[in-house]
Amino acid sequence: MHRTIVWFRRDLRVFDHPPLARAARRGLVIPVFVFDRALLHHPETGPARVEFLLGALAALDADLRQLGGRLILRSGDPVQVLPELVRQSQAEGIYAHTDCERIYGRVRDARLNQALATAGMKIRWFDPPGSLPELLPYPAYRRRWYEQMGEALAPCPPQVAVPPEVIGEPLPGLAQLGHQADGKPIPAASTAAAQALLQDFLEDKADRYYWQLSYPGAEVTTGLSPHLKFGVMSVRQCVQTIRAQGDGGDPRRRRSHQQLISRLRWGQGFGQRFRYLPQLELRSLYRIFDEEGWAFDPDLYQAWQTGHTGFPIVDAAARCLQATGGYLALNFRSRAIYASFLSNLMGMDWRYGALHFMRHLIDGDCPIDHYQWAMQAGVTHCVDKTWTRIYNPGQAAVDRCDPEGQFIKRWLPELADLPPQQLGNPPRRPTYPAPILDYKAARKRRVAQLERQRQRFLHTPHLLPHLAPLPADLTPFGGDRDGGEIRWAAAPTPPLFPPALDLTSLDRTDQAALRTWFVAHVTIPPSRSSRRRPASTGEQLSLLD
């Protein structure tokens, strides 16, 4: 009987899992997860996300046991562990999904391909829906994404038969993996829990989601982000569940359903950008921004991290992140305001912000987190009319995002007695710091800096020479300063797998296709109105001035 190893990575489910379904049809299955120290101790890995991972693995094992199988756990470098498991189990080969989240993972997978080929062993890679190998213009990718989301879900195998002689390790605790719990509440990590969250959203939040998404106090997000990060539920299953629910003729629900599906597409679109350009994990899209360097003040950085900037909505986001890992409580708008403050108003390298976020976010996903950070810093879409994303963190932000002060008062109890109209610029008091910067002056400096930098390439029809290449040194940002498992970066590196775009070999058609992923090239600077917008209404918010 055929024997196939199914290597689980960020696809911790039994439903809509093509490698598992195919392996189960062939015969015996060895479902394996490898605890990889280089990922567990990556500079951006935090204990809360590892704790969620452990919960997801326990749930996956339970689901496999319901099918007659079990999850085999191993520890070590997959490049060594998996070929040895092939030999021990007498498997014919390995099935696995490709994964483009991390440069390290693509280096590891390339090395694994080499090791298996040298040993005469086989591996078959499956691209998950929404991750495409070819370079497409973004509109074509968008069409293909919707097509793939409508394709039939891979069925759950009726049985997963595991060879009885293949033995795994027991599920370790957090401390055994070298992490200590930091007090964040960890949500249930099973597929059933993810399905319940989605159903709760569709029944109780969909009539409000689109209109209240920008208000952190409303808490209308789905709560699915950590489950999607680890593939506890597939994006395709989410999309099809939303479509199957229907809107009952309610235009508000219809708009919210469309918005949520768009958010799922955006998230996978960030992953596709990283598939093309993995250097976005380490660098800004345009080389000039990193080559000129960034200011760094450790005291100001600490004030931003801990929520002591003197801007209440920024400080509330800071404290919420550290207390909750962002789960359900820290929505996109809050994250954007918090991020823009560091990179634009404080003038610090956006990568320090991404590093801090990833260490705390339970749902931290590198392409989503890093690309959004670069966008907020103004170093990605800087040839477009939306090239600046500088938020006013004062009363304007409170009026538009937290008009009743619910979010701020929850996380800043020292300001709980103030009316909402004072929460943007609270009166001085000994229990809360004064603002650490002048918003108007900081904004003026940042706009002038970005305008000067982007003039280097704004009027050229050929942006390719200005894009940052994949660096020779692949050491993760923060590794040299804050430690982590980075020894892998010192070894000779094969071409990544899946392969990245070779910027030196793109023809004009390819260059035009790549350009569409980073918005259209324009030369007209954005117009700004000095008229103050009214306080928040029931409509979805746009970017702040």
Show the residue positions of the predicted features.
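C-terminal catalytic domain of photolyase/cryptochrome flavoproteins
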Residues: 211-545
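A charged, amphipathic alpha-helical module
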Residues: 156-254
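Hydrophobic beta-strand scaffold residues
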Residues: 29, 71, 122-123
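N-terminal beta-strand-loop-alpha-helix module at the start
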Residues: 1-68, 451, 471, 478, ...
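Conserved short loop/turn motifs at secondary-structure junctions
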Residues: 73-79, 83, 99-103, 226, ...
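Residue-level signal for inorganic ion chemistry
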Residues: 23, 94, 139, 231, ...
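N-terminal Rossmann-like or analogous alpha/beta NTP/dinucleotide-binding catalytic cores
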Residues: 39-93, 103-107, 134
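Beta-rich, aromatic/charged-enriched effector core domains that present basic-aromatic interfaces
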Residues: 78-192, 374, 528-532
